Amino acid sequence: MKFGLFFQNFLSENQSSE
């Protein structure tokens, strides 16, 4: 599912922000 990929990307970005 594309949604899963988008969600993972969002999480990855969130971690990068920290």
Curated annotation (Swiss-Prot):
GO biological processes: bioluminescence
UniProt catalytic activity: a long-chain fatty aldehyde + FMNH2 + O2 = a long-chain fatty acid + hnu + FMN + H2O + 2 H(+)
Top EC group: oxidoreductase
Keywords, in A-Z order: Flavoprotein, FMN, Luminescence, Monooxygenase, Oxidoreductase, Photoprotein
Any one GO MF annotation of this record: alkanal monooxygenase (FMN-linked) activity
Domain of life per record: Bacteria
Coiled-coil ranges (or none): none
SS bond list: none
Complex formation: Heterodimer of an alpha and a beta chain.
Cited function: Light-emitting reaction in luminous bacteria. The specific role of the beta subunit is unknown, but it is absolutely required for bioluminescence activity.
Family, per entry: Belongs to the bacterial luciferase oxidoreductase family.
Name of the featured protein: Alkanal monooxygenase beta chain
Name of the gene: luxB
